[in-house]
Amino acid sequence: MSKQNKIIGIAVILTLIVAGVVYGISSNLKHNEPVKTTQEDKNQDVILSLSYDKEISEGSQEEIVIPVKLSYLPSGVFPSASMSVEFDKDKLEFIGVKKGTMQDYSKTVPEWTFDVDASNKSGVVNAIYIDKSGAKNSYYKSGFEKGKKDVVLNLVFKLKEEAKSGDMLNLNISDAVFATVNGDTDNSNLSTAKNTMKNKNLILEVR
């Protein structure tokens, strides 16, 4: 199976998981009302971005911590989310994920699920978040504040010996979804595939 087919397959599986969780939470919520889109929501572009502003030197063994930031979170309940980030597995080693700063309804920072070994084999970090509490641990607008509470999670890498000075290492968000309770009916899901959320990728330069 080609790398592209694997990515497509994983994306389909994650989408089905997200859809199933959203359906389950939707069925159990006491106040399952349509998302009320505000004028601010309509005027704002939602961008999921990778960023890193430190110098990376050849041979360095320091952790490379890359924040995954959201530019804006619209009104609504977001009980599940997923993202796939491609990286150069020959020159970068994926170490894991550290918590971000975005909070859920309970004012805690959600923990995402990921597989280090599978990521390093495929060159794709697949991370997923599912709220199993019935919405109290879902992402809400109140848990987002640009510049303070806008980091969804942090991806952690290390350089491999194969990475040399002058190398340009691409990290690309190939797919990402923040699913709402009623996303299938009111089109409120944030999705890079549906262009309701944009992505900003990253190039790391080895000095």
Task: Identify the role of each PLM range.
Residues 2-207:
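Acidic, low-complexity intrinsically disordered segments
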